[in-house]
Structure formats: C-alpha cells, structure tokens
Amino acid sequence: MCPGPGSDSQGLHQDDAHYPVPRPHQPLVANTLIALDDFTLENGATMLVPGSHKWAKEINPHEDIFRAEMSAGSMLIWDGAVWHGGGENSTKSQIRRSINLNFNLSWLRQQENQYIGIDSNVVLGMPPLLRRLLGYNRVNHLCGGVDYQDPLEYFEARHNL
C-alpha cells in the first residue's frame, strides 16, 4: 500500500466483514502492517478503533480512533474484526509505503485468490514453506486437497519437481 501526497483517508472497515458470522466472534483474520516509511499523522498513519472487535454491531466507529504512528520497520498486528483504515495523507511530498499481510483461519476462503494471481513460475521459485503459507496445503485429509492429494505435492508433480 502506498498512499501518496493528497490521498484521501480510507473508510473505516473490518477485514472479516465478508464472513457471515455473528459478532462478536473468535478471531478469524490476523492483520499485519509493516511500515516501510515512518507513519505520521500528516502522512496518514493507520486508524484503529480499539475494542471494536468486541462489538455485536457497528456503534460509531469514528469515536475513540487511535492513530498508529510508528517508525519505518515497525509492525502493527490487529484482529481483522477491528474497525480500521488508512488515514488521509495531507503532505505535499511524502508517500506512506507499507506491506499489508492478512492471515485467515485455514478453513476460511482467503480474500485474494493468489492461486491464479501469482504466476506459477514465481511459485516454483518459492520454498515449500512459503508455498504452504500461500495456501498450497490441506487443512485436514478432506479440506483443500486436489484429487485427494496434498495441493503442494500435486503442484510439484505437475511441474516435475
């Protein structure tokens, strides 16, 4: 994510809102945000509403907003049910770069379909552990397999590894 100078704030949202589960609920998604640049109020430090993951319904997510000011290299981790969003970048020249990684429970469908979004040649260059982290694995003997096979073994066999 790279909000540039003059970027509007992102609307407050929850990253697990697309799962039809009553609230509050057990954590479904863990969000991580790694700051590549300093996060300041001026360049749009991420906004979070502490405790909002415990709400049964939206109350007023614009109350009690915490701004995650942090130094480059810092990591912010939060429950995907927490209301959050990127702040407005009111600077004239600063880009606020970050790497955002979301992890959901293994039995839930991920938000992005990386199986077709990442070229197979790129996947082939990844270590097996990273391939499994992307989702080339089974949850148990029934969920996530391909023709009753482990997806990583299936993928590797198709590419003669």
Report residues per predicted region.
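Active-site-proximal flexible loops/turns
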Residues: 20-22, 44, 57, 86, ...
